[in-house]
């Protein structure tokens, strides 16, 4: 794991390109961050880049789905709340364990509904959220361009229908994905810095 850049140093993305001039750390307490949004929004790409810049571990939430969920999604079957329950509990436990150990953590997780996010916050008070969003056309295009992922583009419509964007009282950072990844990551980092607590 790379260390965070020095105060005022040049932050770099996972690809090594500069993304921000960032003063770190982002506050007195370790950062616990969920990068959320529907499939195709870039949760893994942006989340891993932010984690690398900040010198924090990153967990790909999709890798924590039980095999049954993966099989359902691969077959084009949308997950229900019940299907997601154990998965969300696993992610919540990872966040809670990191917080208890005083270790920051960045996780990618669709977290489509407020009730799902409440589960995560229940195990990790003070959890920060970054909501990546974009047009349905752009999301669909990105899903079609992906290789090696079990989530078919046909499930995008159900995810968009399920999505409950974070409300004002959830204190989420909302970022449009219309720009290339580096500017998106830079925006996330700058807004995390501006709202550090």
What are these regions (language model features)?
Residues 1-31:
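Extreme N-terminal, non-catalytic leader segments
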Residues 35:
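Hydrophobic anchor at the beta1->P-loop junction of P-loop NTPases
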Residues 38:
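P-loop (Walker A) phosphate-binding loop of NTP-binding proteins
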Residues 43:
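Conserved lysine of the Walker
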Residues 48, 52-90:
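Conserved substrate/cofactor phosphate-moiety recognition/catalytic segment
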Residues 82-124, 132:
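Glycine-rich phosphate-binding loop used to anchor ATP phosphates in small-molecule kinases
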Residues 124-143:
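Conserved phosphate-donor/acceptor-positioning beta-strand/loop module used by diverse small-molecule
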Residues 145-187:
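Small-molecule kinase domains that catalyze NTP-dependent phosphoryl transfer to phosphate-bearing small molecules
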């Amino acid at each position: 794991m790379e260390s965070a850049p020095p105060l005022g140093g040049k932050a770099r993305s996972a690809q090594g390109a500069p993304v921000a001039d960032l003063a770190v750390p982002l506050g007195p307490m370790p950062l616990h961050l969920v990068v959320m949004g529907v499939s195709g929004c870039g949760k893994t790409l942006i989340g891993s880049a932010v984690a690398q810049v900040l010198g924090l571990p990153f967990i790909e939430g999709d890798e924590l789905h039980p095999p049954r969920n993966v099989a359902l999604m691969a077959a084009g079957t949308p997950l229900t709340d019940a299907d997601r329950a154990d998965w969300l509990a696993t992610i919540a436990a990872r966040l809670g364990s990191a917080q208890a150990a005083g270790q920051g953590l960045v996780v990618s997780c669709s977290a489509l509904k407020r009730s799902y996010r409440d589960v995560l916050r229940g195990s990790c008070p003070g959890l920060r959220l970054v909501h990546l969003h974009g047009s349905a056309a752009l999301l669909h295009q990105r899903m079609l361009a992906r290789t090696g992922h079990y989530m078919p583009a046909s499930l995008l419509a159900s995810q968009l229908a399920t999505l409950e964007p974070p409300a004002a009282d959830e204190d989420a950072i909302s970022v449009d994905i219309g720009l290339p990844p580096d500017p998106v990551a830079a925006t996330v980092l700058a807004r995390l810095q501006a709202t550090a607590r």
